Design a protein with these regions (language model features):
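Short, ordered beta-strand-loop transition motifs
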Residues: 1-7, 138-139
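Structural motif
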Residues: 2-3, 45, 64, 84, ...
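Generic recognition of long tandem-repeat/solenoid scaffolds
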Residues: 4-16
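A mature extracytoplasmic/lumenal domain signature
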Residues: 10-12, 34, 46, 55, ...
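Extended Gly/Ser/Thr-rich low-complexity repeat segments
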Residues: 15-35
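Right-handed parallel beta-helix
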Residues: 40-84
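Short, surface-exposed interaction patches in beta-rich subdomains
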Residues: 70-161
Length: 161
């Protein structure tokens, strides 16, 4: 309750759920501790979430509506990203595998390093500015599996300067 800021002290596992009424728009900034979480879940609905840094072994981000902006994400385990009709922007500096499901929203991801992306059938996705389609292979543990039937996904695998 500090002008829309939520400051979280170190805990091993955390679930943050933000639900607001649709006619109101809230911007909530979350300051997380420097040490990584073993399990971190960030869920937003009809609100705007902004995080400077997120670090954890298992990180799940779900954006039903509204937006989620994450300036730096480090995930040493499994990453789960689920966007319904909202917008997610994030920069990922550590990644070891996971999935991205986007229904009708917009997802923009910048990777610090090259990341192997596996696209499912019927998905619209742009990788490094070029339209990408499924090559028919199955995702492995260290891949980012992307499913987006009618939303927009943009992925850059360039080093952020």
């Amino acid at each position: 309750e500090d002008d829309g800021r939520l400051i979280v002290e170190q805990v091993p596992s955390l679930v943050i759920t933000l639900f607001t009424r649709e006619q109101f728009s809230y911007r909530i900034e979350i300051q997380l501790p420097d040490k990584p979480f073993s399990n971190l879940n960030l869920y937003t609905a009809s609100s705007d979430l902004h995080c400077c840094a997120v670090s954890g072994y298992m990180v799940n981000i779900k954006c039903k509506s509204g937006s989620a902006d994450i300036e730096r994400l480090s995930c040493s385990g499994t990453l789960g990203i689920d966007c319904d009709s909202g917008k997610i922007n994030m920069y990922i500096d550590e990644f070891s595998g996971g999935s991205l499901v986007n229904s009708t929203g917009t997802v923009n991801i910048d990777f610090a390093k090259d990341a192997d992306t596996v696209i499912s059938q019927g998905t619209r996705c742009y990788i490094n500015g070029l339209a990408a389609v499924s090559d028919g292979r199955a995702a492995e543990d260290d891949d980012l599996a992307v499913t987006s039937p009618s939303g927009r996904v943009r992925i850059n695998t360039n080093i952020k300067r």
